[in-house]
């Protein structure tokens, strides 16, 4: 599905049911394949159908508002054929009443909707610490989801009883009403009011789940976080979504990761960035200093004559490549050279002597350039 469902129908996110229906009627009339012969009309019509199917039902609309399309992926499909209109039939009868002979009677007979259905996919947003994202590991999470009722094994019926075929629709889940007009005959197909489209009626409902066949439960599970994930990474945990209906397979759980910022380290792809400060003498003479990395403390060699803001590299100390943790990026360290604003009299004399020795005491860009106004402090 391309685009936001509200944008597809051209309505605001807080629109009412009547406004939603008007927008749907207008667009469905415009893009119905029997009316609009443009190459993209059929695909557009499917998008409009899918958007209205989700937003017209309060329960699926609430899930969509909260989780996006992942939250309603089990509710129908974008490519559903036109023969299974269900509750759309009354709208289409109105939309196309002006087109002679065209109506829902042109579609196939009502198709039973009471078979096994896949459970909905679920979304979980999970925050990770900086190092958790780099090295991965196991994470325990808790998810509320629908599980098959253990009391009735998902049938919805009280123990020792079973569901009966609906006498109103004879198990089809739909009822049809024929209407004759000067423009032709129309058949209005709608969801059976007795069984709610299930095709079956439960006389004695399971006391545990109230006849739904599923119960809301909170489940604890451990998931594996691969090394090298980043904010925006999506993990799929198979079969950990809502339980299916009437023996259908469960949906999947999609975990969206967000990585917390770190006080010392930043990330650029598979490289880690940080900064250290050294004295001007360390920059001039060189040194070996201890630096923090995600692996712990490491030795970093400061070459003599290091220039301010020079970037030194610790190879292989960066982020593992996602899917290939043996391959790692580098740790790039920007070295800040700290120039003192005040020095002791002895230090100043020594620096003057050094400047005279180099013949650069008053020349720009020499020691005086490096040390700023150090020689002129009183």
Curated annotation (Swiss-Prot):
Keywords, alphabetical: Chaperone, Cytoplasm, DNA replication, Metal-binding, Repeat, Stress response, Zinc, Zinc-finger
Residues at which Zn(2+) 2 binds: 166, 169, 192, 195
Cofactor field: Zn(2+)
Protein's job: Participates actively in the response to hyperosmotic and heat shock by preventing the aggregation of stress-denatured proteins and by disaggregating proteins, also in an autonomous, DnaK-independent fashion. Unfolded proteins bind initially to DnaJ; upon interaction with the DnaJ-bound protein, DnaK hydrolyzes its bound ATP, resulting in the formation of a stable complex. GrpE releases ADP from DnaK; ATP binding to DnaK triggers the release of the substrate protein, thus completing the reaction cycle.
Record organism: Picosynechococcus sp. (strain ATCC 27264 / PCC 7002 / PR-6)
Repeat positions for CXXCXGXG motif: 149-156, 166-173, 192-199, 206-213
Binding residue positions for Zn(2+) 1: 149, 152, 206, 209
GO terms under cellular component: cytoplasm
J domain mapped to chain residues: 4-68
GO biological process, one term: protein refolding
Listed name of the protein: Chaperone protein DnaJ
Entry's localization field: Cytoplasm
């Amino acid at each position: 599905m391309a685009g936001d469902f509200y944008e597809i129908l051209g309505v605001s996110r807080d629109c009412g049911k009547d406004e939603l229906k008007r927008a749907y009627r207008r667009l469905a009339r415009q893009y119905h394949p029997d009316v609009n012969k443009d190459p993209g009309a059929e695909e557009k019509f499917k998008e409009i159908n899918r958007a209205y199917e989700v937003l017209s039902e309060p329960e699926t609309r609430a899930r969509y508002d909260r989780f996006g399309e992942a939250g309603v992926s089990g509710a129908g499909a974008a490519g559903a054929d036109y023969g299974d209109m269900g509750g759309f039939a009354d709208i289409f009868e109105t939309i196309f009443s002006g087109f002679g002979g065209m109506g829902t009677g042109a579609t196939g007979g009502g198709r039973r909707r009471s078979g096994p259905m896949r459970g909905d996919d679920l979304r979980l947003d999970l925050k990770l610490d900086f190092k958790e994202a780099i090295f991965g590991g196991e994470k325990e999470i808790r998810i509320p989801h629908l599980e098959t009722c253990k009391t009735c094994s998902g049938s919805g019926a009280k123990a020792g009883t079973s569901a009966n075929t609906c006498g109103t629709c004879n198990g089809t889940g739909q009822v049809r009403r024929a209407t004759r007009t000067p423009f032709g005959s129309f058949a209005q197909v709608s969801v059976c009011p007795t069984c709610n489209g299930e095709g079956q009626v439960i006389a004695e409902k399971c006391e545990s789940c109230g006849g739904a066949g599923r119960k809301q439960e909170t489940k604890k599970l451990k998931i594996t976080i691969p090394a090298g994930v980043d904010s925006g990474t999506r993990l799929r945990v198979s079969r950990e979504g809502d339980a299916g209906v009437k023996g259908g397979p469960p949906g999947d759980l999609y975990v969206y990761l967000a990585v917390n910022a770190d006080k010392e380290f930043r990330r650029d792809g598979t490289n880690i960035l940080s900064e250290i400060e050294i004295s001007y003498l360390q920059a001039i003479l060189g040194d070996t200093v201890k630096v923090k990395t995600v692996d712990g403390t490491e030795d970093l060699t400061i070459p003599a004559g290091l220039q301010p803001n020079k970037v030194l590299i610790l190879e292989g100390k960066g982020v593992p490549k996602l899917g290939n943790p043996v391959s790692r990026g580098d740790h790039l360290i920007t070295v800040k050279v700290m120039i003192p604003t005040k020095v002791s009299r002895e230090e100043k004399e020594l620096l003057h002597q050094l400047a005279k020795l180099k013949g650069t005491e008053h020349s720009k860009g020499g020691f005086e350039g490096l040390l700023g106004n150090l020689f002129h402090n009183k």
